[in-house]
Amino acid sequence: MNGPTGGATGGSLGEKREPVLLYDTTLRDGAQREGLVLSLQDKLRIARALDEFGMPAIEGGWPGSNPKDIEFFAAAKKIHWERAKLAAFGSTRHKSNRPESDPNLNALLDAETPIVTIFGKSWTLHVDEVIEVSRAENLAMIAESIGYIAERGRELVYDAEHFFDGYEADAAYALDTLRAARDAGASTLVLCDTNGGTLTNRMSEIVRDARAKLAADKGARNVVWGIHSHNDAELAVANALAAVDAGVRHVQATINGYGERAGNANMVSLMANLALKSEHKVAGADRLADLSTLSHEVAEIANLAPDDHQPYVGRSAFAHKGGVHGAAQVKTPRAYQHIDPALVGNRGRLVVSELGGKANTGSRAAELGVELANSGLD
């Protein structure tokens, strides 16, 4: 059964071969990377590149937070998007406002996107000490905000901020925040590892437990489950894949892993892993050979140097410096490469160095058109 954002609602916890919806948040969460500044035109260029590639959902920004994002959504209304649905992002209503008078919620409606993503508090620490409301009021803020948007015909994604930390602190309350969102009309529930510190095995346990507990609610309606992981413990991609294995079918990530602090889950690696190493269908799989181009194009627009050592798409991702490795690669490219680099638009290379052997030097000479006859290296 397909969910409202293109993913599957899920039945048993261990399903395979279901489509996984990729939701790109480069233009919003990725833009929070220190040193990364995107102009309005930069954002539009990246959005067009993502749409051309086949990204199903693109989060364009937070229209309630800054004028540039308001301008982005105004410009986006005039563009015909071939494949992507645009999403506008914002928070639940302010504690002092009713939904209908809340500027943030009304800015989301004014963006006129098919998808609206609202985040709310799952962690009692944030409820008690950050937004400083009662726990009952926080549940009301979630339900009323989502209801206000959903009743106006938008597809509603709920981002449960700090869900994993909240679950560890008070699992019952964290689950109640999800129920408030679901029952108010959210079609997708996204579990966010906002501080990026959850270990992979624990993430799997919590995702499975949350899904099972909400599915057991009497009269519960189906929702799509999502994941939003950060890389503070260098586990963002692994955690997202573990969440998919635990039943998640909506994955939020950024191109090249751009994001605040240590970054977000890397959409490039996630797409390659899911398309090449899992049984799940992912949008963009038919354009996988353009993945390196997409990665480098976004880096260029962002005025950031590509990471040569980035998995799959980096210049050195399939480079072989050691002589033993180089000799083996000449005989069979599978010897020291987990995939054919061409599948993601990359290429293998043998590197000339003091660690290299004849194969490395010979390969480089051939690339340069240098004749090695009688050199002892042929």
Region spans (language model):
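Alpha/beta enzyme core
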Residues: V20-L22, R28-I58, S65, F73-W81, ...
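Short, glycine-/Ser/Thr-/acidic-enriched flexible segments
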Residues: L27-D29, R93, W123, D232, ...
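Hydrophobic alpha-helical scaffolding
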Residues: L36, W62-N66, H94, R135, ...
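Catalytic alpha/beta core domains of metabolic enzymes, predominantly
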Residues: N195-T198, E205-K331, A335-Q337
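A glycine-rich helix N-cap at a beta->alpha junction
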Residues: E82-F89
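Short, glycine/charge-rich beta-strand/loop segments that flank catalytic centers
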Residues: G90-H94, K121, Y312-A317
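A mid-to-C-terminal "edge-of-domain" accessory segment
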Residues: N2, G6, G10-V20, D24-T26, ...
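Generic beta-strand/beta-sheet core signal
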Residues: G61, F89, F119, D159-E161, ...
